[in-house]
């Protein structure tokens, strides 16, 4: 398994991560600068490229250890998710998403094409499960809203292709959002990200 965390390795199937992975190895012991230094506290010890390294908890727990390394089903998630089930039943279809997919099922079942998103769909559920068409939002580009629709709880988000046609919410767009040249340092409001860019509204 390559740093993309999908069965096809780091090829085009992963959104062409390659160097975008920041040089994190398949074991992701040292994620590299692209990961923000989450290190061992990350629930997904494989790098999921979107196209940068993202150390995203597959479930809602802060670390694999706290999820219960004794859970016994780490292997089924490629060693990335100690206790998905204990984190809200988001164990869904880890294997089918190349091991990096903690919560396919937690997206309400509409997340059927994890593979089409490069298999690096770290935390579908964290976007509220409303992410039906991840491909149309360029989900492989997002390291924030997983797969890429911006929602109130996504935190720092909105890579260059994240919010089209999605809209950012007030808490999503720090430090940048939507298109590469817009809304810095402003946050997008609900109407600003369609269809191309967002104007700063304060």
Swiss-Prot record:
<feature type="region of interest" description="7 X 4 AA repeats of C-C-X-P">
    <location>
        <begin position="48"/>
        <end position="195"/>
    </location>
</feature>
<feature type="repeat" description="1">
    <location>
        <begin position="48"/>
        <end position="51"/>
    </location>
</feature>
<protein>
    <recommendedName>
        <fullName>Keratin-associated protein 5-10</fullName>
    </recommendedName>
</protein>
<keyword id="KW-0677">Repeat</keyword>
<dbReference type="GO" id="GO:0005882">
    <property type="term" value="C:intermediate filament"/>
</dbReference>
<feature type="repeat" description="7">
    <location>
        <begin position="192"/>
        <end position="195"/>
    </location>
</feature>
<feature type="repeat" description="5">
    <location>
        <begin position="172"/>
        <end position="175"/>
    </location>
</feature>
<dbReference type="GO" id="GO:0005829">
    <property type="term" value="C:cytosol"/>
</dbReference>
<comment type="function">
    <text>In the hair cortex, hair keratin intermediate filaments are embedded in an interfilamentous matrix, consisting of hair keratin-associated protein (KRTAP), which are essential for the formation of a rigid and resistant hair shaft through their extensive disulfide bond cross-linking with abundant cysteine residues of hair keratins. The matrix proteins include the high-sulfur and high-glycine-tyrosine keratins.</text>
</comment>
<feature type="repeat" description="2">
    <location>
        <begin position="54"/>
        <end position="57"/>
    </location>
</feature>
<feature type="repeat" description="3">
    <location>
        <begin position="144"/>
        <end position="147"/>
    </location>
</feature>
<feature type="repeat" description="4">
    <location>
        <begin position="162"/>
        <end position="165"/>
    </location>
</feature>
<feature type="repeat" description="6">
    <location>
        <begin position="182"/>
        <end position="185"/>
    </location>
</feature>
<comment type="subunit">
    <text>Interacts with hair keratins.</text>
</comment>
<keyword id="KW-0416">Keratin</keyword>
<comment type="similarity">
    <text>Belongs to the KRTAP type 5 family.</text>
</comment>
